[in-house]
Regions:
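Active-site phosphate-binding strand-loop segment of PLP-dependent enzymes
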Residues: 136, 141-191
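Aromatic/hydrophobic pocket-lining residues that form π-stacking "cages" and hydrophobic walls in ligand
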Residues: 18, 124, 185
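Short acidic capping loops at alpha-helix termini that bridge into adjacent secondary structure
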Residues: 83-90, 110-113, 160
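Conserved PLP-anchoring active-site segment centered on the Schiff-base-forming lysine
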Residues: 106-128
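A generic structural signal for well-ordered alpha-helical segments
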Residues: 22, 128, 188-189
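N-terminal small-domain helix-loop-helix segment of the aminotransferase-like
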Residues: 4-94, 102
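A short helix-loop-beta submotif of the ANL/AMP-binding
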Residues: 130-136
């Protein structure tokens, strides 16, 4: 059986391509996967083992383990002063990309457009394409600290625009969204 055209037309991950090139090179410092260069701390490993020994080896709720969602809710309230219901407003996914995929699936229809910074994390395009939406690159520049400006963001909006992906700090540029950037994105979204 041959793979579908949807599968064959997915863009290859530039990050994985770089990972494959660098993995067998000596003295290479890899910035590819965004994982730490240290072993998981011992107390975390021991806590995971303890939970396994206690029988926590089965499927979780679809939204994730309730005590974890409750702790996330508590932390959000304490640190960010926002209140989310752990039983209906918080979902734990198996990773950031799965969370992005689910958010895109929930918010856009096939053919809808999603604005993304250019340059941006290469896997965003794949996530968007897998949801049969259209990635619309919005150039960001060093002179603007790789932040969206009103003009460059607004110029890419069409009647098909349904979402804007804002990643801060941005991979790969390192740009950090300022309050002004957040207000700009909100203004464009509301218009």
């Amino acid at each position: 059986m041959k793979p579908t055209s949807s599968f064959l037309n997915l863009p290859q991950s530039g990050i994985r391509r770089m990972y494959d090139l660098a993995k067998n090179k000596k003295d290479t410092v890899s910035f590819v996967l965004g994982e730490p260069d240290f072993v998981t701390p011992k107390h975390i490993i021991e806590a995971a083992k303890k939970k396994l020994d206690e029988g926590c080896t089965h499927y979780t709720d679809n939204a994730g383990i309730l005590p974890l969602r409750q702790e996330i809710s508590r932390a959000l309230k304490q640190y960010d002063k926002v209140d989310y219901d752990p039983e209906g407003e918080i979902v734990v996914t198996v990773g950031g990309m799965m969370g992005m995929y689910m958010a895109i699936l929930a918010l856009v229809n096939p053919g809808d457009e999603i604005l993304i910074a250019d340059p941006s994390y290469t896997n965003y395009v794949g996530e968007i394409v897998m949801n049969r939406a259209v990635a619309v690159p919005v150039p960001v520049y060093e002179k603007d600290n790789f932040n969206f400006t009103y003009e460059n963001l607004k110029s890419r909006v069409t009647d098909k625009t349904k979402a804007i992906i804002l990643n801060s700090p941005c991979n790969p540029t390192g740009g950090v969204a300022t309050r002004e950037t957040m207000e700009t994105v909100a203004k464009v979204a509301l218009e």
